[in-house]
């Protein structure tokens, strides 16, 4: 462990709770919010993989929008909630233990970074809200 100088994390589903956008709207979505959130995430991953296999790359935000549209239709969520859900996705909540873990690692002088399929703009917004001590990649494509 002495030779480890940096720790790299995935953002979505590791540092940030991808279900938190839907959870913040559970009063409007109702009891189906968790199923909806899980379906949205599953669809998002499926779209990413399929488009990659088909060599039809779309950036992560476009995939997020497309998967939200399909999920809203499947769960009969009012289309007026689309922009609210997308805005909340830009500022996903971190998992509750993450701030303390990152703080502890930073205090031990580890360099902390994110490696993600998220766009730099999305990652910058997430980190600006929650974790200014994380290093983000400067390249827009992985």
Segment roles from a protein language model:
Residues 132-137:
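Conserved small/polar residues in nucleotide/adenosyl-binding loops
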Residues 22-23, 37, 41, 61, ...:
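An amphipathic alpha-helix signature
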Residues 34-41, 79-87:
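Short, well-structured alpha-helical segments
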């Amino acid at each position: 462990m002495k030779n480890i100088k940096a720790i790299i994390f995935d953002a979505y589903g590791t540092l940030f709770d991808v279900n938190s956008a839907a959870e913040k709207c559970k009063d409007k979505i109702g009891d189906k919010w968790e199923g909806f959130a899980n379906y949205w995430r599953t669809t998002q991953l499926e779209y990413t993989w399929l488009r990659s296999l088909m060599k039809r790359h779309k950036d992560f935000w476009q995939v997020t929008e497309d998967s939200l549209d399909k999920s809203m239709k499947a769960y009969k969520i009012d289309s007026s909630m689309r922009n609210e859900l997308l805005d909340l996705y830009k500022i996903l909540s971190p998992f509750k233990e993450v701030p303390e873990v990152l703080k502890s690692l930073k205090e031990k002088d580890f360099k902390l970074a994110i490696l993600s399929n998220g766009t730099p703009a999305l990652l910058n917004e997430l980190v600006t809200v929650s974790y200014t001590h994380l290093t983000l990649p400067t390249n827009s494509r992985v």
